[in-house]
Amino acid sequence: MNTEILGVILQWVALVVLCYPLGRYIAKVYRGERTWLDFMAPLERGIYKVCSIDPDEDMDWKKFLKALLMVNLFWFFWGMVLLCCQSWLPLNPDGNANQTPDLAFYTCISFMVNCNLQHYSGETGLTYFTQLFVIMLFQFITAACGMAAMAGIMKALAAKTTKAIGNFWVYLVKSTTRILMPLSLLVGILLVINGTPMSFDGKQTITTLEGQEQVISQGPTAAIVPIKQLGTNGGGYFGVNSSHPLENPNAFTNMLECWSILIIPMAMAWAFGFYVRRRKLAAWIFGVMLFAFTAGIFVSVPQEMGGNPNIDEMGIAQDLGSMEGKEIRIGSAASAMWGMVTTVTSNGSVNSMHDSQTPLSGMMQMLNMQINCWFGGVGVGWMNYFAFLIIAVFISGLMVGRTPEFLGHKVEAREMKIATMVVLMHPFLILVGTGISAAVAAANPEIGWLNNPSFHGLSEMLYEYTSAAANNGSGFEGLSDNTPFWNIMTGIALIMGRYFPIVGQVAIAGLLASKKFVPESAGTLKTDTFTFSLMTFAVIIIVAALSFFPAQALGPIADYLSF
């Protein structure tokens, strides 16, 4: 147990220490300053030339968003065609079949919005070709889109008065060539060294120690897992995700993959500070996020290490903690840590079965996604926090009788309305979707969605919509979700949960940047203080967390009390 706790502490320290220099590097990339990866410039110029992109063009926020949405729409149709035709394409040594249109529709949406909620198993639901040219491609594109959107917001907030927020295409390309690809290459090499396969051979039949034959799936796993983690995507190469011994072979790869999930979202908080020259503000934002993340660890890890009280009553020793749904080579503490990391971001990959974790751990995982701004997805997580910042600035300004301003830009009714709609859309999608599904399940029990009725069954449905709306992708897998109903309902939540906030937040930044710059004065509300950070935290808890309390009370809290 002491070794497991030490592993959790080391992961936390490695994240906190290394995210700062990475954030400084990311800010330099988006500012166009010299970096050690400038040798990628010829490749980038080649991409601009082939795609007829003018890298010197400055876009306003409307043109910026149009480019972002169009590139996502194009690749959606690309993925649909390939998934529906994958059995006839090359690199299919196992003869896997085409996906059905509704499953292909759902898969493309899920991966296009950085969610990666999977209603299929990778070994049988995809071919090597579609793993590489749909899944891995989407994982790079969607992560780069989120980072590009944040880069545009940073440029808008750093400027005094401007209508230009940068070039989406340049941010998209640089996010890929100078941040995601180099880190993915490094992580991929370390995974191969530790036993993760990188092959295009088909399934192999082996004889186990018990003398039984077993079919082992393999493939280009080491190429896909790094961007799965670094891009906060989370879609597993194998059906059981990072619980699989070939996707996550040992304790070192477990720590590496867990670190990879959170390092860029953490770094983006610092990148904002370096970009706008407000490191103190970035430190307070980072501190609020880190406090919430660490608090979740202090709840979840002891819960999982403490074991299941029902098993205690049976007189069975639980020296290893609550091990239901967990891998022996990983352990209860590392599984709980991963659960917090994967839900505090929009990653959603798993190294254990979240459905089998104790009720309070499951509640914390849901709460992380329901709040949806503690680090979050690459780029998009900070943007969600930005919406709460705008609300906190507006409320604080009214409370103390000062004009609401953020970084020299007045926050007025229009920005406040957009921020409010962005913040309220998240609970609307989750609670309305869960309510409809609960009503359908109660009226038609023969459909067999729920393997666990009562409180835990409601928790499973609540978790599914929470994961979809937060673009997370993890799930309480006791729910039978590969049906047209769930594919369509959660597909709607995926689209709205991804694009509505991005459009709103980029619009807010563009509107703020176009206003006359107001220099700081004695009457300016300070946003880089403990008091304002506490105010922002309170706004997040009141507006986001408490919106879900009734649903949490009927689901995981009731589940815990009946444990």
Where is each model-derived feature located?
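Membrane-proximal intracellular helices of multi-pass ion channels
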Residues: 1-563
